[in-house]
Amino acid sequence: EQHANPNFAQRVLADQNLTLIGEELFASYGASIDFRKNPVTESFIASIAEDARELGLQYDVYPSVMIAQAILETGSGGSLLSKAPYDNLFGIKGWYNGNSVSMKTREDDGTGNLYQITAAFRNYPNFRASLTDYVSLIRGGTGYNQTFYQGVWRSEANNYLQATAFLTGRYATDTSYNNKLNSLIAT
């Protein structure tokens, strides 16, 4: 059976015979959020995909996870923070080469309750700098723990599902972060 519209096509198999490993992964798959492909998202992906692929290979990071994070963090490149002159694709706080911008953001208290704060976010000269800084953070960790994001590395995570699960509660306070990323990757 095939469903199609101008912006999205999906093939649904009537019988999905999965291997035991596949069934186990499928059971743990948290893609519960319905994202749809659209021209804005497709254009945004095209603007960062090649850099994400190159940097992912170079730094041992899943490009699909990187792209999904950028889509989620920026609303497909539509957020003020992601537009020039800020070019911050990942909502990374702090300073980049001495540059930052203060903006309001919502945080999750770890139980699903949201609250608002004003935070300093890194200000980049372009998307490539934002992507490069992101993989440097994922590979270099935090100032107090260089292996803080080690579970996201391709050499440590068997698949992108494990990588996104590891990011939840570490990279983002959103308790559904991995489900959202998984849904974006599956789309």
Question: Predicted regions: what is each one?
Answer:
Residues 1-187:
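Catalytic cores of secreted/periplasmic lytic hydrolases that degrade extracellular macromolecules
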